[in-house]
């Protein structure tokens, strides 16, 4: 047992340099991060994640919690090293801090780590923890997997050669420094009661476990590193400090899906989507909802139905049912383009407002690179403004979540599909993406539209989601059988299931894949099904003009989709002369702001959620392929 007297220097060593008024010590930062991680586990991490981790590692949920909180509490122990402490920026505190360390026997002479060696504090933390775990009797490969969590808390793991060098450096380290490092780990181990749990872990942690615990440690570290929330100088008790800090950050809580669930399908759709009493859910919506409510464990749910059949509402209703059944705390809805994501955002937020319990506050995020141009999302980002109305919960774009790396941690996110597929890549801080997706229901739209390259990433992503026991809902109008079989097999391969072949040629079609097998259910076409006539016309402007005149004589809306921007511009110039004030041009060459304005106007005029004050008797849209994929509008005629 290391003497508690060695904890004193940990309260002198700096973690955050501060200014003349004070600095934050390593010990205080570790205590802050430990306590934040504890709160996040209790109030933010979904029950589905907790149970998945416990089952995977053959531990109790409380034991996984203790391990995660312990690792958060020692993630920066590597800052108690000569090389890090000497990095303190020049200022009024520098001489005082360094002098205090030397006064307690921690010499600051240049060591081997400062002579061309790569020795960042995250790597040092990992090696220090690894050595401590070995002393507890843990097998080396197991200790390496646990230590990798603190090694990666800055987003990327170290190379093996760097790890070996760091071990060599610490083997030659002055004893007093090693004693202080050990004292910090011992104190955190005692505070979290983790030692008996360490003795139970006999095999290496699974990679998904490492990803999620690392994501939690990163989130806790980022919260505790917020100087406004956790000031360097304070005079309150630690519990109050953590409570006030998280409150000032505005961290969202869990979505209590069970509180707003309705057992009757018609009652649910009326409440969740604001439908009038005389509206009935379509058969595909009723069955998708019922199948999700009857699910048992992780499921892949594929909904194949025509455009305009209500797949979006069916998916959201099924997502709510899955969330209630499996303890998920949110929904991610991924669309193929920014335009379709923008169009979905308002619909998802309106649904979320209706399914969040009254008095609760949840976070929302629009996940793509141009979200700053979307007025609906920016409106939610204004602090204190939400869609809260009488009897409904609050859905707000909270400031802490409003960044690319943290956005998917929000309860409700609408994204472009790449934001989900990137979980299959190696990228910095990707653990946060895993943490954000693991506790949710994931909906992916237009899966038939992705090429072979994108589909390969989609299959890898489905494997990750199956590892985390995430319910996944795939939407498609025309999904080829071979692609569906590949997607089903990707998800089920993690569950240890055999290959599967589709046997149904029904349409619309619902497919459920889980550990119990694969079930296909075809449905009768409802009375509101859309039928389309397809014909081929000549490739001249004159024939296009004549066709528009013939088809839209008595009113209606048409979309003319061209293969190139130049062709769209030429067709627009020709049509606008014949139909002034009735033609809009959309294509990818507009600057981002102008494109966002045009897309917003089109969705307001023609989208699923139209302005009641705007009725267009005649309307024509000319655009490139982007307009055809991403319009999300209701049109009577589509030409290509």
At which residue positions do the language-model features occur?
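Conserved strand-helix element at the start of the C-terminal RecA-like helicase core
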Residues: 331-333, 338-341, 550-576, 584-585
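Conserved interdomain linker/interface between the two RecA-like ATPase lobes of SF2 helicase motors
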Residues: 495-570
């Amino acid at each position: 047992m290391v003497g508690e007297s060695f904890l004193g220097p940990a309260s002198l060593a700096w973690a955050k340099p501060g200014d003349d008024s004070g600095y934050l010590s390593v010990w205080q930062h570790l205590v802050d991060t430990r306590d934040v991680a504890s709160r996040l586990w209790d109030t933010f991490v979904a029950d589905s994640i907790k149970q998945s981790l416990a089952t995977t590692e053959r531990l109790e949920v409380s034991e996984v919690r203790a391990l995660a909180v312990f690792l958060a509490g020692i993630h920066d122990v590597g800052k108690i090293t000569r090389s890090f402490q000497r990095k303190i920026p020049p200022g009024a505190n520098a001489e005082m801090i360094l002098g205090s360390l030397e006064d307690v026997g921690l010499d600051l002479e240049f060591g081997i780590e400062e002579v061309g060696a790569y020795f960042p504090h995250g790597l040092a933390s990992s090696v220090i923890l690894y050595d401590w775990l070995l002393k507890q009797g843990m097998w080396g490969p197991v200790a390496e997997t646990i230590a990798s969590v603190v090694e990666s808390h800055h987003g990327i793991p170290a190379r093996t050669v760097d790890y070996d060098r760091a071990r060599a450096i610490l083997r030659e380290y002055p004893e007093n420094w090693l004693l202080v490092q050990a004292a910090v780990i011992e104190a955190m181990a005692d505070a979290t009661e983790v030692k008996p749990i360490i003795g139970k872990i006999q095999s290496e942690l699974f990679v998904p476990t490492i990803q999620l615990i690392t994501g939690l440690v990163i989130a806790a570290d980022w919260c505790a590193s917020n100087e406004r929330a956790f000031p360097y100088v304070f005079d309150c008790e630690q519990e109050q400090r953590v409570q006030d800090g998280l409150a000032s950050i505005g961290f969202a809580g869990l979505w209590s899906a069970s509180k707003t669930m309705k057992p009757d399908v018609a009652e649910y759709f009326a409440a969740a989507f604001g439908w009038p009493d005389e509206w009935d859910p379509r058969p595909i919506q009723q069955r998708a909802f019922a199948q999700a409510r009857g699910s048992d464990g992780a499921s892949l749910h594929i909904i194949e139905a025509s455009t305009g059949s209500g797949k979006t509402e069916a998916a959201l209703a099924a997502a709510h049912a899955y969330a209630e059944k499996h303890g998920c705390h949110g929904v991610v809805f991924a669309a193929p383009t920014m335009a379709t994501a923008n169009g979905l955002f308002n619909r998802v937020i309106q649904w979320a407002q209706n399914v969040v319990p009254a008095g609760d506050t949840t976070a929302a995020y629009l996940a793509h690179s141009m979200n700053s141009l979307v007025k609906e999302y920016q409106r939610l980002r204004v602090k204190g403004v939400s869609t809260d109305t009488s009897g409904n919960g609050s859905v707000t774009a909270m400031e802490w979540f409003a960044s690319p790396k943290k956005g998917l941690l929000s309860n409700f996110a609408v994204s472009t599909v790449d934001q989900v597929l990137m979980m299959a890549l190696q990228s910095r801080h990707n653990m946060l993406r895993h943490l954000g997706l693991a506790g949710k229901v994931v909906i992916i739209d237009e899966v038939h539209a992705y090429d072979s390259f994108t589909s390969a990433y989609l299959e890898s992503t489905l494997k990750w989601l199956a590892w985390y026991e995430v319910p996944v809902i795939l939407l498609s109008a025309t999904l080829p059988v071979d692609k569906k079989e590949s997607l089903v097999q990707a998800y089920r391969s993690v569950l240890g299931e055999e290959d599967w072949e589709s046997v149904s040629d029904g349409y619309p079609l619902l497919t459920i894949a889980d550990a119990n097998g694969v079930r296909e259910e075809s449905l009768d076409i409802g009375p509101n099904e859309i039928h389309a006539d397809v014909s081929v016309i000549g490739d001249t402007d004159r024939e296009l003009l004549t066709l528009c005149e013939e088809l839209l004589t008595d009113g209606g809306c048409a979309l003319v989709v061209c293969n190139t921007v130049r062709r769209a511009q030429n067709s627009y110039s020709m049509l606008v002369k014949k139909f002034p004030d009735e033609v809009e041009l959309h294509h990818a060459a507009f600057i981002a702001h102008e494109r966002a304005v045009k897309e917003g106007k089109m969705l307001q005029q023609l989208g699923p959620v139209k302005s009641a004050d705007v009725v267009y008797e005649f309307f024509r849209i000319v655009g490139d392929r982007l307009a055809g994929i991403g319009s999300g509008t209701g049109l009577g005629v589509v030409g290509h």
